[in-house]
Amino acid sequence: MILAMISWGASWPAAKIVGQYANPQDLIVWRFAFALVAMLIVMKIFNIPLTFPAKSLKFVVSASMLILIYNYNYLKGTQVGQSGLGGVIVPTLSPLLTFVFSVLFLKNKLQSKESIGLVVGLIGAVLLVRAWEMNANTVISSGNIYFLLGATVWAGATIFTQKASFELHPINFSFWVYGIAMLFALPVFPIDALTAIFSYDWIFWINFILISMIALGLGTTAYFITTMRLGSGKASSFMFIVPFSAVISSSIFLGEVIALTTVIGGIFAIMAVYIINK
């Protein structure tokens, strides 16, 4: 599980490297395809049936649309912005947004400690995106808009995942979500991108396999298996590894300078998630 979370963190600078070769719309379908292959292998090893989500199909389709939007923002954000910052914003803010959505749409009650956690999380968010410097141009050019949208749609996908959990094994659910998302992406998939990917060098392929088969396919699978064995509370605590892995790997491989506000904001966001889940 620790290796899976490290791979999630390392996938952020890897996505930036991949973004130097092609645009998001050229890569999304292939990313889903490689992840599906990895999931099929895992499902075969663990004898997980490929059950069609008949009863929860509307939740699967809804989650698929959000996952497609998330992957575009993930690839576009890392292409134009700092991958290390994205690797802090998305993993730390998405659990907070998931909690907010669960209160709004699932009618979960808000307790006092959870209110404190949300305030702490808001402070963290302000520091992460350096809200005092924000205007329309800097939000887009910095890539922060894509990271914020990514965190939001990932939280929405998590809500639909919870609604579908009664019918499907988590890995089976992920397979159908990514599979349907791939179908949704096909209409905007350029024809020349079908073969262009095979002309890229080994640097591209190492990083692309990391963000698709390892991080998206095997990493997600490891997370779900740990969730089933340890429970969602303990499993989610491993997510705290992701921001630090993203920051360190972005600094090592891309030479990104991580701002102090990113570190402090990430700590505040992690504290908020801890307070809410305590």
Predicted regions and their residues:
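Glycine-/small-residue-enriched transmembrane alpha-helix faces in small-molecule transporters
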Residues: M1-D26, I69, N73, A136-K163
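Specific transmembrane alpha-helical segments of multi-pass solute transporters/efflux pumps
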Residues: S7, S11-W12, L40-V90, L127, ...
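Membrane-interface helix termini and inter-helical loops of multi-pass transporters
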Residues: P13-Y21, K76-Q79, S83, V129-S142, ...
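Hydrophobic/aromatic residues within transmembrane alpha-helices
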Residues: V18, L27, R31, G77, ...
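Hydrophobic alpha-helical transmembrane segments of multi-pass integral membrane proteins
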Residues: D26-I41, I45, L57, V61, ...
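Helix-helix packing/entry segments at the starts of transmembrane helices
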Residues: I28-W30, Y72, L85-L93, F160-L183, ...
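Hydrophobic transmembrane alpha-helices of multi-pass small-molecule transport proteins
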Residues: M39, V61, K113-W132, A185, ...
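C-terminal transmembrane-helix exit sites in multi-pass transporters
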Residues: I41-N47, S94-V119, F244-I264
